[in-house]
Regions:
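Formylglycine-dependent sulfatase
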Residues: 1-337
């Protein structure tokens, strides 16, 4: 009997594809570049929302956030309402599940390290192991196939600040400020260049973490039967995070699939982050529920490429701007309500 593939997901938080493999000449990303050289890179992958919890709710369910009531972000005080959910949590339709629940029911060991932030409370059935020590190495039977998620938080927006919790995020900036390309919608000032430099340093740090995970796969003899995904929830910085411009929803997407994808492949078809869930299920041979709105782009159940991707912005914290966006390969239409 052929062993089913393992799946390793590595999420870079708040991260536009400022990677060497995407043509960025400033970035120092050897692990990402190696992964892309051994697999495929998508140039038109997009998130369904430009902020954490709505975007992640779409990823974990394979559903548009606007379809399951998770399109708002941090929309309450965080206090519990009687014995019900916390006030900022949505209550999703009863038939919608975290797709890891389907994998678990089919025999996969599922671990998540460590962020959830789905805008709804993840059920106890979502993960075998969820927390700061979550790892495929914790599975009781090492013969079990696994789905392991690692969320690399160093690239989170908060680590672009000069200080965090009263301490400098980076005491010294190890990037030449003059080499940095400032987007035309930012003022070209020293402060802005320093913020962008911190972003590059955060990406470099996360790249090293990715390298450690890849070495762990090799050490465990798992690299040849593990499909590795790198993706992000949404973009960074002002005009990126929280806004459905390309700078806010364009996601890096790299997949290393030994014997399944030729190394160094560049693919330009449209992919939405809600397609990640059905794609993993397709690769693992797990039946997809009919209500799932994402479509598989790899594996036995892969579908035809999308014509359009969709994104939405709703009430985020105290801000209530309502925006919808649709994009094809060339144009994007954005509607403000």
């Amino acid at each position: 009997m052929v062993k089913r593939p393992n799946i390793l997901w590595v999420s870079f938080e708040d991260c536009y594809p400022h990677f060497g493999c995407y043509g960025d000449k400033v970035a120092r990303t050897p692990s990402l570049d190696q992964l892309a050289a051994e697999g495929a890179l998508w140039t038109r992958a997009f998130s369904t929302a430009p902020v954490c919890s709505p975007a992640r709710s779409g990823v974990i369910t394979g559903m548009y956030p606007v379809s399951i009531g998770t399109h708002h972000h941090r929309t309450g005080s965080g206090e519990r309402i009687g014995s019900l959910a916390y006030s900022y949590e949505a209550v999703i339709p009863h038939y919608v599940k975290c797709f890891s629940e389907y994998l678990r029911a089919d025999g996969y060991y599922c671990s998540n390290n460590a962020k959830t932030d789905y805008q709804f409370a993840p059920p106890i059935t979502a993960w075998d192991d969820c927390g700061a020590t979550g790892h495929w190495r914790n599975r009781p039977d090492t013969d079990d196939s696994f789905f392991a998620v690692f969320n690399l938080g160093q690239t989170h927006e908060s680590n672009m600040w000069e200080e965090k919790n009263g301490e400098p995020v980076w005491p010294e900036l190890d990037f030449d400020l003059e080499s940095i390309e400032v987007p035309p919608y930012f003022p070209d000032t020293k402060k802005v260049r320093e913020s962008i430099a911190r972003n590059y340093m955060n990406i470099e740090f996360a790249d090293r973490q990715l390298g450690e995970l890849m070495r762990a796969l090799e050490e465990d003899g798992l690299a040849d039967n593990t499909i590795v995904f790198v993706w992000t929830d949404h973009g960074p910085m002002p005009r990126g995070k929280r806004w459905p411009y390309d700078s806010g929803i364009r996601s890096p997407l790299i997949v290393r699939w030994p014997d399944g994808l030729p190394g160094g492949t560049v693919r330009d078809e449209l992919v939405s982050t809600i397609d990640l869930a059905p794609t993993v299920m397709s690769l693992c041979g797990v039946e997809m529920p009919r209500h799932m709105q994402g479509r598989a782009f790899l594996g036995a159940k892969a579908e035809a490429p999308r014509e359009y991707v969709y994104a939405a912005r709703d009430r985020y914290d105290e801000m209530y701007d309502t925006v919808r966006a649709v994009r094809d390969k060339r144009f994007k239409y954005i509607r403000h309500y």
